[in-house]
Amino acid sequence: MKYICFWEFKPEDFDKMIEKYKQAMEGREKVPEKFPKILFGPYSLGGEWKGFTVYEDATPEQMTNLILHYTPEEKMKFVPIFEGAKFIEIYMKMKK
């Protein structure tokens, strides 16, 4: 399953966030299964201190590890995302 993670932080925490991001990337190299696999991103929303990242096959433990790594500076919200064609297929089966 894929998840989109919306994140945001305060401008005054930007230096801390850069350091935490570097630590997370190094951690991914050493222990790849600690955090969810990045499918694409992170992307920031223009002119704002927030953005999103899409993760693939994220387990609850990996999501928790990621949240705890960036806490308290960053707020995160994980939302499952579905392929439109698959969603329609399941919906049509349910209608029968």
What are these regions (language model features)?
Residues 24, 63-72:
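Short amphipathic alpha-helices in soluble, non-transmembrane regions
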Residues 1-50, 58-62, 83-96:
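Short S/T/G/P-rich N-terminal loop/turn motif that feeds into the first structured element of a domain
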Residues 73-84:
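Conserved short beta-strand edge segments in small beta-sheet-based binding/regulatory domains
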Residues 50-52, 75:
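Short active-site oxyanion
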